[in-house]
Design a protein with these regions (language model features):
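Generic hydrophobic alpha-helical scaffold/packing signal
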Residues: 64-68, 95-99, 109, 113, ...
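Glycine/Thr-rich phosphate-binding loops of Rossmann-like dinucleotide-binding domains
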Residues: 14-15, 148, 167
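Extracellular/periplasmic ectodomains of large secreted or surface enzymes and adhesion receptors
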Residues: 156, 160-182
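Solvent-exposed coil/turn segments that connect beta secondary-structure elements
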Residues: 10, 142-144, 162
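Acidic, glycine-enriched loop/beta-strand segments at the rims
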Residues: 86, 104-109, 118-154
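Active-site neighborhoods of metal-dependent hydrolases
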Residues: 1-101, 174-182
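Divalent metal-coordination and catalytic microenvironments
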Residues: 5, 79, 98, 108, ...
Length: 182
């Protein structure tokens, strides 16, 4: 289609007081400074503001569903501007939002992989698993095409032809998300 959107629903969702990562283990990846801010709701968000935010998210999901149904290109990204929006998990949460918007789990996976390649004009080189294409790969336990929550059950990660153990990758990130750069 001629219309492309990058809704970043999870960014909107992440500032709502009820938003939480899937389990406490995600807190281990945050720097101590960011971890302290994790439970803090924005000062401007009172009860009325939270209700307004929830309504806006519902409308945003409906808009995404309509664009997708009409052939628009939906893209996935997260804009990790909230202390609650942990990189990696944020993309999983955005895919879950795509499913709540009415896309199938397989369509949500395609949005997070194939559609980015299409938008970049690189669909002939990346974005899908096909002979002759470059691909990084995440192997998961279970079938995320039937349950998007399984996308986080990582067994192996392949990057540039090298296999990585997810536990080792996670350990290397422990306590580092949100550290100042420089």
């Amino acid at each position: 289609g001629d219309v492309w959107i990058t809704p970043t629903m999870v960014t909107l969702e992440s500032v709502h007081p009820s938003f939480q990562p899937p389990d406490e283990a995600w807190l281990d990846y945050l720097s101590p400074e960011l971890g302290e801010r994790m439970g803090q709701a924005p000062a401007y968000l009172d009860e009325e503001g939270a209700a307004c935010l929830a309504g806006a998210l519902t409308k945003q999901r409906e808009f995404v569903r309509r664009v997708h149904e009409r052939g628009g290109l939906v893209l996935a990204r997260t804009d990790p501007v909230s202390p609650k929006l942990v990189p990696g998990y944020g993309l999983h949460a955005e895919m879950a939002n795509l499913v709540r918007a009415g896309l199938s789990p397989l369509q949500a996976i395609s949005v997070a992989s194939r559609n980015g390649a299409v938008a970049l004009g690189l669909a002939d080189e990346i974005g899908t698993l096909e002979p002759g294409k470059r691909a990084d790969l995440v192997v998961v336990r279970g079938d995320p095409a039937t349950d998007i929550a399984r996308i986080g059950n990582t067994v192996w990660v392949f990057k540039a032809g090298v296999r990585y153990d997810p536990a080792t990758l996670r350990e290397s990130a422990r306590g580092k998300i949100g550290l100042p750069t420089g």
